[in-house]
Amino acid sequence: MKYLVKFFVVTFLLLICTHVSAEQKIAYLDMKFVLNNSNAGKGAQDFLQKSFKENQKKFVDEENALKKEENDLLAQKTILTKEEYQKKSDNLRKKVIDYQSQRRLSLEKITTQRAEARQKLLEILDPILKTYTEENNISLVIDKKDVLVGNTDLDITNIIVKKLNKKLPSLSIK
């Protein structure tokens, strides 16, 4: 008799728990898609890629010039005196160090700009998501990358992208 009562109590509790979870409305959102395919996100990415390519071209040209200077210096090694060679070699090392420093600073600047653009997008996206979840009685929004299998009706990505495009058509990056 004791076991029968325990069985009914456990069964009753399980049924209550499943009923409560059935009332929760859950949706999922592909954050990567939203950030990369919204108008503001695309504009920011295009700007950052263009900036990176311009810097890359400039640095490749500068690197080639440094390599040429190094080869010229090595070719003149037998002609130059030891002091002149040492002086030119030290000068070349300083140029290489400056080049590496400029390249690092350029990459850091682009990384910082990317992080700032992402942060701005997320700041604008947060109230849009809150408003949408309140209007549609959604209890929980999960990132799509954390969902193994889900009904496509629960995917709110395209709706949020449209709302984000309406609210933020472009993003300025400094």
Language-model features: locations:
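Bacterial N-terminal signal peptides that target proteins for export
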Residues: 1-8
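N-terminal signal peptide c-region/cleavage motif recognized by signal peptidases
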Residues: 17-18
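Amphipathic alpha-helical segments
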Residues: 23-147, 167-174
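Active-site microenvironments of hydrolase-like enzyme catalytic domains
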Residues: 151
